[in-house]
Design a protein with these regions (language model features):
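Retroelement reverse transcriptase polymerase core
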Residues: 1-196
């Protein structure tokens, strides 16, 4: 995180350079809220656990795959030292972005959800009772991704595995387990030194 000359914080990523973060609080205040519910994490975990084979797919730059209506693009306008810009695709920071994205993903996979796969935002879990069944299910999901121009981040995808991490939990045929690496990180945190 670095600050520009106006004291605004700009997030940086070591691997991919600059990442633009826009403060859309003023826009969000006047935006009519979309109350589309996100799935409950515990229910997602229950549905995906207990299978012998999995494929874990990750949507590439999730929100950014959704186009913004031309009439709404001007609402995302921002100015930076390089000029004035407006997004053509949905950025982070818009209050309705999570609901819009989840609705879109559920629409894309409406006939597959809870039967051969589960989707939570840009995380897609495909499963099967046998290796062959999981492979057939994966093929169906990948065909749908191609059909709908949904781009995946292959570096974050895992294919035909016995277990994996979903929403911070380890899932497998045995069920749901806590990710011990996450617990260790929390245990190693220093104790708070101030009280608010």
């Amino acid at each position: 995180m670095v600050q520009n000359e106006k004291g605004e914080e700009i997030t940086t990523r070591l691997t991919s350079g600059w990442r633009v973060c826009i403060d859309y609080r003023k826009l969000n205040v006047v935006t009519r809220k979309d109350h589309f519910p996100l799935p409950f994490i515990d229910q997602v975990l229950e549905r995906v656990s207990g299978h012998p084979f999995y494929c874990f797919l990750d949507g590439y730059s999730g929100y950014f795959q959704i186009e913004i209506d031309v009439a709404d693009q001007e609402k995302t306008t921002f100015t930076c030292p390089f000029g004035t810009y407006a997004y053509r695709r949905m950025p982070f920071g818009l209050c309705n972005a999570p609901a819009t994205f989840q609705r879109c993903m559920l629409s894309i996979f409406s006939d597959m959800g809870e039967r051969i796969m589960e989707v939570f935002m840009d995380d897609i879990t495909v499963y099967g009772g046998t290796f062959e069944e999981c492979l057939v299910n994966l093929e169906a999901v990948l065909h749908r991704c191609i059909e709908k121009d949904l781009v995946l981040n292959w570096e974050k995808c895992h294919f035909m595995v016995r277990q994996g991490i979903v929403l911070g939990h380890i899932i497998s045929e045995k069920g749901i387990e806590v990710d011990k690496a996450k617990v260790e990180l929390i245990v190693k945190l220093p104790s708070p030194t101030t009280v608010k």
